[in-house]
Amino acid sequence: MDKMNPDIVIPVKGLPLGESSFRFEIGEPFFQAFENGQIKDADCSIRVRVVRHQTLLDIVCEIVGFVVVECDRCLEDLTLKVDTEPHLTVGFGTVDVDDAGVEDDVLVIDHTESELNLNQFVYDYICLSLPLVKVHPEGKCNPEMLRYITDNEGTETSAEGETSRPFEGLKELLKNKDN
């Protein structure tokens, strides 16, 4: 699969019992398909290992690569490493999870399905592998933006251009209470 064809699809029909392996490469076109995405660009390799049982598929996706996101501090591009290995269990038709011996969540698909699209699964796990706060290492942020943040720290400007102090009114209430 080339990075211009962003679908991660596993053929389910005709998949032999036992282990099968698939490789995919994803880049910017893959992430553009998702609205409101935080990932601007990427270069990731995905190795999908599928173990087919009689009524289940055990899927492991080894996702390794880099993604480009916006720095939360300076808004410049920030490249982050991705290295995650999510697991997914897929059942056919109506699978009784207790009988199958599976404790994790099971995605159930109709037994007539011929393929399984893993796009959303891969996208979600790449996003979950990213840190909550995405910032450059100390000293690597855009110095001009940091200067702007430092100069304007602690002040808010109202619509009229005046600097607002949200706790000023509370201080007045405390003064009046003491009197």
Model-predicted segments: where are they?
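A positional/architectural concept
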Residues: 1-70
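Residues that cap or initiate secondary-structure elements
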Residues: 28-30, 54-56, 75, 96, ...
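Charge-rich, low-complexity linker and terminal segments
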Residues: 1-17, 43, 83, 89-179
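Short cysteine clusters
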Residues: 71-74, 141
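Solvent-exposed beta-strand sheet faces enriched in polar/charged residues
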Residues: 60, 81-83
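Cys/His-rich microdomains that often coordinate metals
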Residues: 78
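Arginine residue identity/basic-tract feature
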Residues: 23, 47-52, 73, 134, ...
